[in-house]
Amino acid sequence: MKNKKTALGSVRKKRRKLQCIETFFQTNDLVTAKQMLSSIMQYAVNGKDWLKKDPSVILQFHQSLNLFIREGYMISKKKKKRKVNAASYIGSPMMKGSLSAKEYENPLLVFKRAFKEYSIQEFDYFISGIVYFSQQMYRYGPESNLVRPYIHLSKMLDAAYLMLERGIQKNDSKKVK
């Protein structure tokens, strides 16, 4: 008899740490991603005008943000197994971006806090909503609160970029009782 394992299951390779986030920042640098998110958010809340960018660019950004959110969720679940390398000297407060001092020291906290407050589905709903409302003029705007998910997503972008810069390692230290 033939082996009935699927090709995906039998050939599955170990994924590198932060591979989706690396890919996200290869296609969108941090500044561009935050500007795109900010402009989509502004047009979604405004309602009197729509974002006049190529819809394919916005759709690609929407899809890459969805993958980014899923990778962030996986990071938040593996928090105890990973540790971000120590921060170097902070030259100016602008280097921290939207992160607090504690979040700058440990960017994994950003993901833990974001997914403690919102689920993946709620982030998907938020991203889909702002993209939808930024693409058209409307009379009645979005129903839900858009500010909190936007702040979390902006912080996650900053934290993920820091994690890529510093590197991440497994936390092998065990607590002694």
Give the location of each predicted region.
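Sequence/structural signature of long amphipathic alpha-helices
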Residues: 1-177
